[in-house]
């Protein structure tokens, strides 16, 4: 194949490539002009049949023609790819000025909302929020809180024990271990709120769940009395349930407080009624608990209280079934919006 015929074949290929409208057409034209049966590839294969003294020049002509065609093909391909990308971007372009339907906004879970609301109340009183591990040593969960070795709360019927046997590790049954850790780590006076998730071997039903949330409070200072405890609970209750809320205390027993009491609340509910409802437990910190963390009960006193977040949400918002809070159905969460 002569130099002139090679140039002619190259020019024909270049002209054909310029006429391609898209990448698919360009690929088909490449097969026509650079495929096995096209003139330039055939000329390249025939180089072996040319006399040696002519082969060098013939090979140079073939490579020059092939190089022109390959270079132009790459240029046209780049142009068509850019064109295609512009078309795709144009098709996917979003006109942000066009009116559209309102995007559905998600909502925090009501337990999260209530947890944050309660924490904000304590922070507003100048208290700190303290947290601790959910897998806890028995010492912090029971021993330091004045639970006797044979207390029924330690049994497998009430507590999840973590293996191996004898490890003395449990899933915490309350957030009270955070109080112990805080008293060991902090200098008195101490005013902390302890929110968190706790675990007990309860069956899931309308009023119980094996995994739930608590908020506990602890104050340790000089001269604290039950009057300070009552005032703190009154303020918390009115912030949560409304200004008409009342509280009352009923004598009870807890290992970690002495004296101890159950606290009830009365408030007008969202269904138009009102009545007394058991809310949580409270009392003055047992002197044995203070001694366990190195605080002299002759110099300092303290009060503590705790209540369940799920139970608080349930009777405050008139919810009949606690299972709705744990099953993850978005239809339950959305009505609460961004505030409970």
Curated annotation (Swiss-Prot):
Nucleotide-binding as a keyword of this entry, yes or no, is yes
**Where does this one sit in the cell?**
Cytoplasm
GO CC annotation: cytoplasm
Species = Corynebacterium efficiens (strain DSM 44549 / YS-314 / AJ 12310 / JCM 11189 / NBRC 100395)
Subunit structure, interactors included: Tetramer of two alpha and two beta subunits.
Homology family? Belongs to the class-II aminoacyl-tRNA synthetase family. Phe-tRNA synthetase alpha subunit type 1 subfamily.
Which UniProt keywords are given for this protein, alphabetically ordered?
A: Aminoacyl-tRNA synthetase, ATP-binding, Cytoplasm, Ligase, Magnesium, Metal-binding, Nucleotide-binding, Protein biosynthesis
Q: Per the UniProt record, which residue ranges are transmembrane?
A: none
One GO molecular function term of this record is: ATP binding
Classify the main location.
cytoplasm
What's the catalysed reaction?
Answer: tRNA(Phe) + L-phenylalanine + ATP = L-phenylalanyl-tRNA(Phe) + AMP + diphosphate + H(+)
For the ligand (Mg(2+)), the binding residues are 258
Enzyme Commission number, as recorded:
6.1.1.20
Q: What is this protein called?
A: Phenylalanine--tRNA ligase alpha subunit
The protein's required cofactors: Mg(2+)
Give the GO biological process terms.
phenylalanyl-tRNA aminoacylation
- How many and how are cofactors bound here? Binds 2 magnesium ions per tetramer.
């Amino acid at each position: 194949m002569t130099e002139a015929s090679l140039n002619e074949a190259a020019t024909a290929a270049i002209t054909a490539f310029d006429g391609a409208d898209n990448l698919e057409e360009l690929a088909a034209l490449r097969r026509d002009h650079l495929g096995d049966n096209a003139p330039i590839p055939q000329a390249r294969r025939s180089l072996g049949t040319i006399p040696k003294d002519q082969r060098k020049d013939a090979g140079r002509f073939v490579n020059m023609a092939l190089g022109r065609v390959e270079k132009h093909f790459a240029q046209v391909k780049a142009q068509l790819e850019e064109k295609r990308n512009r078309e795709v971007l144009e098709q996917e372009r979003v006109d942000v000025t066009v009116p559209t339907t309102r995007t559905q906004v998600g909502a925090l879970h009501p337990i999260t909302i209530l947890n944050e609301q309660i924490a904000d109340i304590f922070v507003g009183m100048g208290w700190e929020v303290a947290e601790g591990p959910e897998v806890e040593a028995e010492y912090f969960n029971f021993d330091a809180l004045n639970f006797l070795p044979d207390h029924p709360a330690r049994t497998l019927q009430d507590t999840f024990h973590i293996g191996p046997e004898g490890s003395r590790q449990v899933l915490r049954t309350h957030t009270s271990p955070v109080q112990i850790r805080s008293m060991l780590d902090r200098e008195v006076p101490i005013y902390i709120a302890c929110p968190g998730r706790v675990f007990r071997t309860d069956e899931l039903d309308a009023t119980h769940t094996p995994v739930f949330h608590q908020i506990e409070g602890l104050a340790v200072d000089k001269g604290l009395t039950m009057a300070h405890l009552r005032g703190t609970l009154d303020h918390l209750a009115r912030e949560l349930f409304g200004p008409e809320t009342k509280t009352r205390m009923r004598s009870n027993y807890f290992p970690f407080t002495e004296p101890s009491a159950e606290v009830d609340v009365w408030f007008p509910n969202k269904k138009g009624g009102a009545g007394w409802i058991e809310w949580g437990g409270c009392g003055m910190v047992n002197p044995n608990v203070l001694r366990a963390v190195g605080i002299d009960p002759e110099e300092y006193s303290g009060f503590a209280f705790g209540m369940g977040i799920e139970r608080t949400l349930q009777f405050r918002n008139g919810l009949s079934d606690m299972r709705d809070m744990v099953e993850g159905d978005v239809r339950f969460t959305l009505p609460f919006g961004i505030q409970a």
